[in-house]
Amino acid sequence: MPAPVKPRTTAHTQAPHGMSRRDFLTLGTAAAGLGALGLALPETALATTQAADTNWHAGQLQHLIPAASHDRFLIKASFQAPLTRAPWLMVNGKRVAGEPTDAAGRFWRFDVRGLQPATQYTLRIVDAGGKPLADAWPLKTFPAPNATPARLRILAYTCAGGYDGPAIAGKTAWLDMTARRRLLARGMAFAPDAVIANGDHIYWDLQTSQNKPFARHVRELMWDKFGGALDMSVPMSHPKNEAIFTRVCDYQIGGLYGTTLRSTPAYFLTDDHDTFENDEFDDKVATLPPEPYGLIGAELTQHRYYPEFLPDANRPVWLPGGDKGGMPIDTNSAFGTLRYGTLLEAVLYDCRRFLDNKGMHARVVPQWVEDWLVARTRAEDTAHFFHVPSLPFAYSSGKLGDWYPDLLDKKTGHLVGNQPKPGWQTGWHAQHQRLVAALGQQKQRAAVIVQGDFHASAVGSMSRSAELEFAHPIHAIMTGTLGTGDMGFPSAFRSIETSPALSVAMQEALRPTEKNGFTIIDVTPEKMTFSLFLWRPPEPVDAIDTLQPALVYEVPRLA
């Protein structure tokens, strides 16, 4: 943890979009106490962090993203050129063989088991002859499940993917990659113990980019630069698609992260765009549940670029998304657990991949997954707990994949709940109600949901959901989007801003704010503290390096 430092007094000169001036001044008072959390950094801190990274030599590595538990590391890596023989990962001098995740030998994984909890290891990748391929670096295991750590810090955000190509009619589709990297660097400058990247690591929609007025621009300004159109009639790994697929993912994942996360365990959750489509339903296209080409694409992206979720003693190995050929043993591609001793448990779940259309019986996640989520929510065997769904609770923008029936009335420009929503299933909301009921029934822990997908930052406490009233509110945090450009914010793309769902009673600490950003989550035995950082062009890019929170939101433990 960085040492406490006095926050800069020059931060924040105007209220973020979505906040009144009065709200902003009130929240500014909370932000002034940031030094007590040890969050604020001197102006030179980011420069020092960047310089230290510059001094680390990545060698032939193109990218590297690790996962960790209390006894295991799982690392995905790619190299600038294929390796003809398998590399080794040295772990405190012990060799672990690399396993190829592509046919050419550019992509490799390293699965390190039998480690000691809360222990820092020195890692180094060497070639088959023992020659180093990059500098050594440290990586630490998490505390044992029964340990009692004093604190934990998490960096969380959503929607980091996207190609920052030429503007269309003066509007950007995704944030410039340089600014995106600086936002990531600013978040990493706070020395998080873990990173949660919640969904949409890739934006390369196929059908749902070609049913829009800007379809030609997508083909000419994006697809042609990466080799043309992907062929949906064959898998992404097919020779027709392999080169294009790899260029796209190299740019959006490898190009953003490089080796930045090498010493920080990461949790990459998937969402709709990771299956190469937006969630839509009309008379020509329906993208939920995802088609096989998208599902295979999401699996292949993860197989090569970022780790699956490591096993947890309280998560059944038979859940969907696990137990597949080619995956590391006992891991899961869609449902995961972040367990940090007895301090925190977080459950992560993809809300798109296994969604079904069974009407009143429909589910967003399968029954086995719902059973696991409810059981872990009711266990109350950690000081704190939160859900990390890829689909937000409490908020709506009227799109197909929402938990809610809310629909945009194009005549009034407002959400309505009294019109049929094409493609939407009543069973989705019924499952939503079962999940929030379990959250709201906790006796010792505050109910918290940390969520992604929506291109906004927001914080609110939900006291009612349809017929359910909660004795203690459910705190819903939208962590902020790293990669969204002008055209991707709901007010532009859907002609409506995100807002609390019509069936929800919500006290808003920060109304949905269409800016780029991230959230730092500090966890101690007494409370969780969420610090939300906001920035958006035309604000100066240099301002990112000293960015301070727009909101500091505390959630104490109930008992």
Region spans (language model):
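A detector of low-complexity, intrinsically disordered, Ser/Thr/Gly/Pro/Ala-rich segments
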Residues: P7-A11, P42, L46-A47, T331
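Short, polar/charged, Gly/Pro-enriched helix-capping and turn/loop motifs at alpha-helix termini
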Residues: A31, G38-L39, D312, P316
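N-terminal secretory signal peptides
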Residues: M1-S20, A30
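N-terminal twin-arginine translocation
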Residues: H17-T26, G33-A52, C159
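Residue-level detector of secondary-structure transition/capping positions
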Residues: A32-G33, G129
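Selective for proline/serine-rich intrinsically disordered segments
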Residues: M1-V5, Q14, A40, G98, ...
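Metal-dependent phosphoester/phosphodiester hydrolase catalytic core
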Residues: T26, Q50-A559
